[in-house]
């Protein structure tokens, strides 16, 4: 072993494993690029992003920590969201929550026929965020 060397497993790292996923379509209606980070409460994202906000309440992007999704002006793409875990309290961002998540507002797809369900049983291998915003 070399000092400072990091030896990692040769398997893929699974993130947000066993968290229900919701896929929504988002369009940047503004005239400037918008970037949303991995832990940003998507419900509170820039007002120039047009999407069904209530479906994003209590959720963040299903991407690795430190990553982001960028929306160029006029871009329309699908993104995959997962619920916050832990104590389920949100502070800061645009100040729209600043406290515990109101569980009655969290969209949880349960109907297989729901066009927004986007719930996959394969632990993220169908994650639309990994495919440039397009579901295959």
Swiss-Prot record:
It comes from Staphylococcus aureus (strain MRSA252). One of its GO terms (biological process) is urea catabolic process. This is Urease subunit beta. Heterotrimer of UreA (gamma), UreB (beta) and UreC (alpha) subunits. Three heterotrimers associate to form the active enzyme. GO terms for cellular component: urease complex. One of its GO terms (molecular function) is urease activity. It catalyses: urea + 2 H2O + H(+) = hydrogencarbonate + 2 NH4(+). PANTHER family: UREASE. SUPFAM superfamilies: Urease, beta-subunit. Its main location: cytoplasm. It is found in: Cytoplasm. Belongs to the urease beta subunit family. Pathway: Nitrogen metabolism; urea degradation; CO(2) and NH(3) from urea (urease route): step 1/1. The keyword Hydrolase applies. Transmembrane segments: none annotated. Pfam families: Urease_beta. It comes from the Bacteria. The keyword Cytoplasm applies. InterPro entries: Urease_beta-like, Urease_betasu_sf, Urease_subunit. The gene is ureB. Residues 112-136 are annotated as: Disordered. Its EC number is 3.5.1.5. Keywords: Cytoplasm, Hydrolase.
